[in-house]
């Protein structure tokens, strides 16, 4: 675990469902952010003890990033489930366009329930599956958008982030990055 910016922590863990040959890396990132109102865990997996003890809530970027969230015993904020999900994550459902009570704004990513989150107090952008790094820096994941969703449409949805102060970008399928990486990813 390392502090990548004041009040922002990053760690990696092996995803338990990963199998050789999958198009994403076995090691995935999780984050903790001190929002000023509490410590939020984003897409948590193998949370370090010192952060688990301070955490006040879990925020998921997408419902399939449940990881360790249900076992932490914390309030969970989750995008709507994929129908028909036989075992949806139980929690407070939020959508693109919503602002959570602790200053996290949600932007729709490549699907209505894959959200890109802006943590106002830390000028941080948290990204689930919409932006990934496959060795060329952050980019819109061109293979995962839903049917009929073009990468250009996803970029258009996320461009308002460039009007906000962004100091750090926190992708779950890459290492933390800076504003310049976000600008490059959204410059189709």
Where are these regions (language model features)?
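A generic local structural motif
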Residues: 26-29, 44-50, 64-69, 112-114, ...
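A contiguous pocket-lining binding segment that forms or flanks enzyme active sites
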Residues: 89-120
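Metallo-beta-lactamase
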Residues: 2, 6, 13-16, 38-41, ...
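Short glycine/proline-enriched coil/turn segments at helix->beta-strand junctions
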Residues: 36-37, 52-56, 72-75, 102, ...
